[in-house]
Amino acid sequence: MMQRHAAIGSLLALALVSACKNEEPRGAAPPPPPAAKPAACAGGGGTLSDAQSAAFFPRTTAGFCLDPNGGDKTYGEGGSLPLDQICDMFDGECEIYKGFGVRRVVELRYVDGSGSAATIDVHLSKFGTTEGAYAMFTKRVVGDGDPAGEDTPRPIEGGGAAALGLGTAYLWRGAHLAEITYNDEAAAEPAIKALGDKLLAPLVKEIGAKLPGETALPPAAAALPEANRIPLGVRVVTKDLLGIPSTGGGAFGYYKDADKRYRFAVMVRADDEQAKDVLATLGKGPGAQKEKGIGDGAVRFMSKEGEAPAVEWIVARTGGRLVGIGDEVRVLRSGMTADEVAKVSLGKDEKIARLKDAIAKK
C-alpha cells in the first residue's frame, strides 16, 4: 500500500512540474522598452526633414541630440500630414488650437546621448496671427486656473514670453508656440523637476532666440497695468472676453495687492465708434448702471462664470480702448459672508480709483 501511495505521489509531482513549465506566469510585467544607444549622439545628432523649422532647433543640447533616426512629423501647411491629425497628438484638444488659428505643427524629439530612455519632446505650432499664438500660450500657462497657485509655471527667459512647469516648458514668439517636455518613465517627480529645470531652460532660451517674429505682446495684453500683476498673470481671450455676446476679445490681467485680489480687462478696438458699441452692449445687461466721471464713459455690472459667484466689473472707455476692473472669481466661493468677500476683494471706490489711475497711465 505504501508503495502504491508513493507511486501516486510521484505522478502528481511530475504532473505539477509539467504544468508549471507549460503555463506563463500571470501578472508578469511587460518587457522594458529598448534603451537608447549609448553612442546615439556620437555623430552630432540628427537633422529635421522640415526645412521651415530646421534652423530653429540646435542639433545637440546638454548631452541630448536630435533623434538620429529622424521621426519628426509636420502637420498642416507645408507638411506631409493633414492638420486634423494633431487631435491624436494633443489628446483631443485640436479644436482649441484650431480656434486660435493654428496653421501647422512640427513634432520632434531629442534623445539622451548617454543611452537612457529619457527624451525631450517638442511640439512647435505656428498660428495665423501673433494674437492667436500668444492666446494659446496663455491658455497653456494660466488657462482656467489661478496664476497665483503653487503649481503655476514660473517665468523663464526666452522669446517673447516663456514659462517652466514640472518637466514642461512653454515658449512664445511671434506666430509660434513651442511646447517642450522632458520625459523619463523611470524617474520620480523630484528628478523630473530637477532635470526639467536643468535641461529645458537653456533649450528654451536658445530656441527663443532663433524663432522669427516680434516679441512685443499683442495690443490688449500690452495695455494691461503692470503694478501688482502676478508673474505670467495674463490671459488672452479671442472671443467675448467678459462672457457677454458681441463684445469681442481682449486680455485679462491677474493682480494681487496684499490680501486683495482683482483683475483688469483690456479690449482694443479699431476706432472710437467700435469701442462705444462695446460699452453700449455692456450697459444693456441686467442691473447694469452708468458710472460718471471715468474716462469717456463707464458702466458697472455683474458678471457670472458657470457655478462661481457673480462678480462686479466696472468698465470705462478711453478712445478706442476699453479698460475694466473686477473681482477675482478664483478666490470667491458660494456662501461667503460680506466680511469674507471684503477681505479678498476691492470695494467699488477702490476699483474706481485704480481704474482711473490705469486709464491715466496709458
Question: Where is each model-derived feature located?
Answer:
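Sec-dependent bacterial lipoprotein signal peptides
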Residues: 1-18
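Soluble, non-membrane globular domain cores that form compact, hydrophobic packing
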Residues: 20-121, 125-362
